[in-house]
Amino acid sequence: MHTLIILPGNSVKNRQWGEAVLEHYREQFDATFMLIYDHWETGEETMEFSKEVKKIEKQVNDWSNSTDITIIAKSSGALLALLAINQGVIVPTKCVFFGIPFDLASQTVFKNNWSPLKEFNIPTIAFHNDDDPVADYAFTKKTIEEKGSGNIKL
């Protein structure tokens, strides 16, 4: 079974992005799933990563070990994917990331523990705008090169 997981960015505006990606790729997968973040419903400004990792774990617990998982994630969703993978919650066969805000995550999400990036072993392609208003491209590129395992191609 080939399953697609969509992890949108932090802002509730990214829900529409996730739904569009889900709709676009739905026919190419046996199953699709988009995580709806709790803070979108409560009105809080940012996601609580540990809570969202648990929601991913609950979702995938019922899936067969033979499920082939692809993750498409945007911004904070990419950070969430890195954390969930590092914690062994999910083991995708490939990932596609759009805009990874490592500069924002270094203190708040990773707390200068870069093991989710250093130990990352999933073939991944990442896209990042040169003029990204949220996450600096140069910092993202440098972080992937210096702290990454070599599995994320920017």
What spans do the regions from the language model cover?
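Serine-hydrolase catalytic machinery in alpha/beta-hydrolase-like enzymes
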Residues: 1-69, 79-83, 113
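Acidic catalytic loop of the alpha/beta-hydrolase fold
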Residues: 12, 104, 130-135
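Short alpha-helix in the alpha/beta-hydrolase fold that links the catalytic acid
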Residues: 18-20, 110, 136-145
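Catalytic histidine neighborhood in serine/cysteine hydrolases
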Residues: 30-33, 145-154
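Active-site loop->helix "elbow" adjoining a glycine-rich segment at hydrolase catalytic centers
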Residues: 74-78
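A conserved short beta-strand
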Residues: 90-103
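Short beta-strand/loop motif that positions the catalytic acidic residue
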Residues: 120-121, 125-128, 132
